Regions:
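The first (N-terminal) embedded transmembrane alpha-helix
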Residues: 17-35, 161
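Mid-bilayer segments of alpha-helical transmembrane spans in multi-pass integral membrane proteins
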Residues: 89-97, 118-135
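Final/C-terminal transmembrane alpha-helix of multipass membrane proteins
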Residues: 152-169
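C-terminal ends of transmembrane helices
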Residues: 64-80, 131-143
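Core segments of transmembrane alpha-helices
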Residues: 66, 86-96, 155-159
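Interfacial loop-to-transmembrane junctions
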Residues: 138-156
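Cytoplasmic-side transmembrane-helix entry/capping segments in multi-pass membrane proteins
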Residues: 78-89, 147-151
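Helix-coil boundary and interhelical linker segments in multi-pass alpha-helical membrane proteins
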Residues: 2-10, 34-53, 95-118, 164-170
Length: 170
């Protein structure tokens, strides 16, 4: 474990929270695949379900449904309580998963301390991603004079960002 990892992982936990703020299910789907492939070591934790055989497939299907639903005009704002809360929970859980992937012996923190640090970083990232993503999308939609191109760009940013974070962990 290098000292840089002690800085990198909280940043990644924050960033996966941002991704969850953009798309609530893209972040857990990406981390679930990372756990399934053995890149994210959460098998001996309360997040072991992320690596179970069916979980990545299920989360991927749900993420795809979210991407489709987001393009529909009747989809509620991400800032309504249920949508906002879902993104916060997703960001917090994903942040915890990233932090718990660290080599605990090298860091000198307990699993609970790592999970708490990840929960907080992911939660803050989710707030930033939810509110910032909404603002950027509104700005882009005004420039495009339509919402769908802005939504597709946001989808691409969420997917590519999640892949980048997973590749940094792998």
């Amino acid at each position: 474990m290098e000292e840089d990892d002690m800085i990198l992982f909280p940043v990644l936990a924050f960033l996966i929270g941002v991704i969850a703020g953009l798309r609530a299910l893209v972040a857990p789907a990406a981390l679930s695949w990372a756990a399934w492939f053995g890149w994210l070591h959460v098998a001996d934790s309360w997040l072991a379900f992320l690596g179970w055989g069916v979980t990545p497939w299920l989360l991927t299907l749900l993420a795809l449904a979210e991407l489709v639903a987001d393009q529909l005009p009747a989809t509620p704002s991400r800032k309504v309580p249920l949508q906002f809360g879902t993104r916060l929970v997703s960001g917090a859980v994903c942040g915890a998963a990233l932090m718990m992937a660290l080599d605990l012996n090298a860091v000198g923190l307990s699993r609970a301390e790592m999970a708490t640090e990840g929960l907080v970083a992911g939660l803050l990232g989710a707030v930033a991603g939810t509110l910032g993503g909404a603002g950027v999308r509104e700005w882009l939609a005004a420039r495009f004079r339509r919402d769908s191109p802005a939504g597709l760009l946001e989808d691409a940013a969420a997917i590519l960002g999640a892949l980048g974070i997973v590749s940094a962990v792998a």
